[in-house]
Amino acid sequence: MALFKPETTSTSNFNGICPCTIVDIQDKSADFDWADIYLQVTLLQDGSKYTRNANIVGGFEKEPNGNVSGGSVIKRMYAFFATLNCDAGINIKGEWEDAQGNKIDDIADFLSQYTEEWDGESPGKDGKYLAYFYKAAPKKPGKQAYNVAHYKIYPNGGNCKEQLQKDIDWFKSRGYIKEDTG
């Protein structure tokens, strides 16, 4: 009898730049004293039934009177909102508002309009966004590495894949992305 050796007709690679769908956005800033913004964006990759999280996290720089004066998290948050075509943001007091100045009490609820319904089991398909997925190196040697998504997310189309690759190359060259090699 002849040996059976199946041929691989396609490979599935869930690391690197991949199309994805946003299936949930949670505000976890209340869980951490140091985080003025902590948005956990849950992404479902095309062809996968498993989600990965991209986190937009950080604190504000503040003036002595308590007004927000800056912070790199603000730039990351507005870049993500631009990808969504979302006109929300923060005011000088660090409170969430829409473009008309209306207060947003629950930013996660507000952002839910930019997520897609998902049954928790079906593989992702027709992802509207591109994100970089990778296995993050553990912070301490010998600890577990986790599959994550980088917070830099682009629309899926045009030259966005090339732009995202340039951004990811920059983050890697500066040591902001540390991938597990083991």
Give residue spans per PLM region.
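Short beta-rich binding modules
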Residues: 1-182
